[in-house]
């Protein structure tokens, strides 16, 4: 097993909304290249995921001095023959970390199981898109 670690710092405009002193943050700032729903309308064969992989992403957010955490999304995980997904949030001091992990075990999704695959991908996307809520102190 070889690892590739990439660290990047960036700011993204529009990642949150301020409404009546409450900030709703979108922390899922990226899209997975390999995890998309499969169109089954004309498909006659099994689906092959591009590659086996383990993808780990940490998104760190600094909480502004005059704000505090109102709520963090509950942990999410699912384990299947194809993929393991895990997404957690943690807070230490004025920093929140969203930890996402995706491990692709088996690349082949049988045609008959593609609807189940699509549901797993949809649920994963919804879990990753849950918002962090901050409020004024």
Task: Label the predicted regions.
Residues 1-137:
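A sensor for short, sequence-defined functional sites
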